[in-house]
Amino acid sequence: MVFNIRCLAAVGLTLFCTYQAHASEPPPATAEGSTPAQTLLERGKYVAQLGDCIACHTAKGGALMAGGLELKTPMGTIYSSNITPDVDTGIGQYSFEQFDRVMREGVTPAGLNLYPAMPYPSYAKMSEDDMRALYAYLLQEVPAVKLTNLEADMGFPFNQRWGLALWNWAFVDNQPFTPDPAKTEPLNRGAYLVQGLGHCGSCHTPRGMAFQEKAMSDAGSSGKHYLAGETVEEWRALSLRNLWTVEDTVQLLKTGQNRFATVSGNMADVIHHSTQHFTDADLTAIASYLKSLPPGKDDLPMPAVASVPAVAPDNLFSTRGGLGYTQFCADCHRPDGGGVKGMFPPLNGNPGITAANPTSLLHITLTGWKTAETAAHPRVYTMPGFARLADDEIAEILSFVRTSWGNDAPGTTAAQVTKMRQQLNPQTTDSTAFVTPRLANLLAAANADQVVRGMRLHLQTKALLPNNVGNALNCTSCHLNAGTVADGSPFVGVSAFFPSYAPRAGKDVTLEERINGCFRRSMAGKPLPVTSPDMQEMVAYFEWMKMNTQ
């Protein structure tokens, strides 16, 4: 059985760890009257679920556990294997002893050494009881699927698998977990869950020259490296040491979000398939263990209290980064950086925003984001990728985000964006001729103060003109992003068509009259005096948006 676990891809702004029950611990509660065989299979399903087997061994659109999922590594491409009980292409002919050897030593019945993308160095810590339960579940409960495994595409010398035997000799300890008598039972359990089937270190522990994890536990002189953070496949797996409060970590693993952050990338799938199904006792054990680890020398302290959303920064409308944020980000993340609870994450105090390494932030900005689908949050919210923006624009916006609302992280450079774009090769879907105006370019206008104020009157109409708006609408409620979105009633070129004939009025109307028509009807309010500074500023913004339209 060839496991090629996608642990290296399953990371985002926060943590990834999965549960495996201690041999001395009872399995999850089962229905009254269950037979021993049923109890074993239920426990096996739980172990498989908490080990996130589905995420790695089920290709997109593929059969359950039938493999075929692509995993790109620095050495080449490998594919997850078929772990259904099919006797020809799966694991249907494996004895328990053969299965156990694969899981602990990474060696198949045919003597083939597996690549350590399959985290057998961690699985070696599993108890025999849990290993037998997992074996029983895979062979008796998972439907057999006949699907031939795909060959790995690894370059020389990594395609010489005999070298993996030496790697195993140097770095793999195949002995089960041993509790530390100096630790409490909950901490021992948490350590067992994190270090064993959870294989949290596969993503969150730094790697050495031979691509080995620098530590497999927090013990010994190398223990300071354990879970200290690593960059994997253009994602930054943050340090898990001394993580938040126990309650906050439990909430994140259960729901995909807490008051500090929201998971991203493939971690959303991990939450969906795996960690939301953990028992509360197991989640608490994991969180307690992570909290007990002393922070690393480069770790920023995890906040114990969520940041209170601040007012919009003073430079929101006076810098290119601030205006870029206003145009492309503020609708969801709000001018105060507070986001929308349960939907869009806060940016103030968010560890993924303030991390010294901006890898994940760049990844999300270029390719997009989605929330985890969980029982607590069944609706998935998404963020589009912004690869259509130029590298310097993205750098300006992210630098603004990383230094606003109390955030104090280094700025982002265009060179960093360029490098990430080359690595990800993100695809854009904009095939129209519409060119989105950039609000940041307002600052280059001869009348910059006037047109920026005009833009704000469209964006913050209710707040800035309370005597003229009778409901809660802003101009941008209908004309998205201050009239800059292609399919959101844009303002581009509009002023060139005024004065124009209005059938409703039966006469030619000016742009000022058309604006006041919105105040009267759409906003149930009062018109602006045509010669007022506010009206002149709104018209100036329309004139700036005319662009090249004649």
Q: Which role fits each region the language model picked out?
A:
Residues Q38, A191, S202, G208, ...:
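Extended non-catalytic domains of envelope/secretory-pathway proteins
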Residues P28-T39, N149-A182, A287-L323, V417-S431:
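Intrinsic disorder/low-complexity detector
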Residues T77-Q93, Q98, R104-D129, L150-E151, ...:
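Axial heme c-ligation environment in periplasmic c-type cytochrome domains
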Residues M1-A9:
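Bacterial N-terminal signal peptides that target proteins for export
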Residues A37-T58, L64-K72, N168, T178-G208, ...:
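Sequence/structural segment immediately N-terminal to covalent heme-attachment motifs in c-type
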Residues E97, R101-P116, Y120-L193, L197, ...:
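Hydrophobic, ordered structural segments
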Residues L8-T18:
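Bacterial N-terminal signal peptides
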Residues A21-A23:
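Boundary at the C-terminal end of the N-terminal hydrophobic targeting segment
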